[in-house]
Structure formats: structure tokens, C-alpha cells
């Protein structure tokens, strides 16, 4: 079905956003995680290679392909944790590891995009996201945590709402990116590919 659609439409750009995104699911069912993330991406690449090799493919990956952040050196200050070895934040120079079934399945897909560019000349782009938020997000504790946290915080404004647990001690620092901003980055990348 996918090959037929690609053959008929020959899209200019494919933004491959489909995937299994919950860390807990990847641990409970690593086969589903691998088949969805690695094999699913492979299927998109093959459809493009065979039927529309001029299409730009943008892949939504994850920061979970990098070494576990627990391996980095932290300093706890009054309001947050800091990374003295990375005073301006983390970038793509971190070693790749995967460090979980989820990270491994996404890293496998990342590598296939690199190889399909190198070997077959496909125009591939990989973005490794962290925390996303935006409209139509159906957030849960283990997926879309920023939306989940905001929902729980609003519920707490109601004195009858049940308490909820925040993992950690509240000093964690996370970058969040709105989906509309990401779409703009995707469009710019596609224009430059």
C-alpha cells in the first residue's frame, strides 16, 4: 500500500512522524518497538528508493539515541542541575548509544537514513527531538510528559483533584519545542535539501 501511494503521488517531501514513542512500551514489548520504528522506517525508505528517489525524507528521531544522560557529570545548585562539561547545553557531539529498546530502534532507523543517502543518494534529513508539545497532544505520563504535567497541574487547582507524582526532585531542566515551530524547521530543511 505504501509503495503504491509513493509511486502514484511521487511526493516532494515525506515527513516520517510515525513511530512508537513510549519508553515503557519499548521495554514491555521490544518487538513492537523495533517493528514500528526500525522496520517501519525501512519500509518508507524502500518505497522512496524504488518509486520516488528524488523525494526529500525528513525523519522524526529522538534524543534517546545518545548515551544515557546518567553517565554525564552534574552539579546540583539551588534551583537546578547543571552540566559543567556542557555549559551551553547538549549537542550532537554526544556519543551514540541507544541505551534502551526505544533508543536502539530509533538509532537503527537513523543509520538506515544515513546509509540510504550514502548508497542510494536519497535526500534524507534526521531531527533528534526531545520534548514536544502542542495542540491535539494526547499526553500520558510516559509520552508527552509536558502536556501531562500541565494537565495535572491544572487539575490540582481544584482542591478535589487527586495528588500526582513528579519524577525526580523538580530540579531537572528540559527543553520543550512547540509542534508549530518544528514544522517551520522541517519546511526550511526541506527547502535546503
Language-model features, listed with the residues they occupy:
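Active-site segment of SDR-like NAD(P)-dependent oxidoreductases
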Residues: 20-24, 63-66, 96-99, 130-133
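Conserved Rossmann-fold NAD(P)-dependent oxidoreductase catalytic core, especially the SDR/UDP-sugar
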Residues: 42-100
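NAD(P)H-binding glycine-rich loop region in Rossmannoid oxidoreductase-like domains
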Residues: 2-36, 65
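Conserved catalytic-core motifs of eukaryotic protein kinase domains, centered on the activation segment
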Residues: 24-32, 55, 68-76, 138-139
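Active-site helix of classical SDR
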Residues: 105
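NAD(P)-dependent short-chain dehydrogenase/reductase
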Residues: 70-87, 101, 111-190
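Conserved internal alpha-helix in NAD(P)-dependent oxidoreductase domains
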Residues: 12, 31, 35-42, 99, ...
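SDR active-site strand-loop-helix element
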Residues: 14-20, 57-62, 127-129
Amino acid at each position: 500500500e505504501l509503495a503504491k501511494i509513493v509511486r502514484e503521488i511521487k511526493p516532494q517531501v515525506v515527513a516520517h512522524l510515525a513511530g512508537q514513542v513510549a519508553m515503557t512500551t519499548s521495554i514491555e514489548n521490544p518487538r513492537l518497538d523495533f517493528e514500528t520504528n526500525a522496520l517501519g522506517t525501512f519500509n518508507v525508505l524502500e518505497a522512496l528508493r524504488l518509486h520516488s528517489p528524488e523525494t526529500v525524507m525528513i525523519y522524526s528521531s529522538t534524543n534517546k539515541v545518545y548515551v544515557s544522560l546518567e553517565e554525564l557529570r552534574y552539579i546540583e545548585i539551588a534551583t537546578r542541575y547543571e552540566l559543567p562539561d556542557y555549559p551551553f547545553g547538549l549537542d550532537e557531539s554526544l556519543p551514540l548509544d541507544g541505551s534502551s529498546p526505544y533508543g536502539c530502534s530509533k538509532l537503527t532507523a537513523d543509520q538506515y537514513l544515513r546509509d540510504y543517502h550514502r548508497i542510494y543518494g536519497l535526500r534524507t534529513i534526521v531531527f533528534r527531538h526531545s520534548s514536544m508539545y502542542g495542540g491535539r497532544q494526547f499526553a500520558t505520563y510516559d509520552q508527552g510528559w509536558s502536556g501531562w504535567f500541565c494537565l495535572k497541574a491544572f487539575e490540582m487547582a481544584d482542591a478535589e483533584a487527586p495528588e500526582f507524582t513528579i519524577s525526580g526532585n523538580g530540579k531537572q531542566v528540559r527543553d520543550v519545542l512547540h509542534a508549530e515551530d518544528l514544522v517551520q524547521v522541517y519546511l526550511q530543511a526541506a527547502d535546503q535539501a
